[in-house]
Amino acid sequence: KPREYISFRLGAGTSTFADGKILRNGKPIAIKSARYNARTTYDEALAEIKALKAQGINTLLPDNPQPEWFYDICDGLGVYVIERANINPNEQSQNRKIGGTPSNNPDLVGEYLARVKAMYYRTRNHSCIIAYALGGDAAGNGYNMYKAYQWLKGVEKNRAIICTSAEGEWNTDL
């Protein structure tokens, strides 16, 4: 006998990745993106996102986790989101020695995986999510990003996974 009901809007649509392209319902999408972080109320964010959509923006790139209602707004308006894990180390280094950068420090792998898992489980049921990003633009690459990519590929079979710091390495789909 159910003890609790939680309402959740469902969106229809599939996001997949093939031949270097993000597909929505099997068709390639032309992404016109903008960085956006909901630092406002629901009503203000709704108005801002509607205005961005009116300008032709169809994809939002938040820098960090957003309030749950942000994803609900995007689901409702048909705006796509490339969700980013909250991995933004202050140390920016291209030092590829073990420990030379936080992303290549095996002591931090648990923290990296926890953030990627939180991102995935928080947003996996939102139809607006078309791809996942493994951290900020300056997150660097290395052991922790490899492990994060492998874990995410193990649970997410359809959406693209992006590591902007991969620079030609294997741990990114785009």
Please give the residue ranges for each predicted region.
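N-terminal carbohydrate-binding accessory modules
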Residues: K1-A54, D72
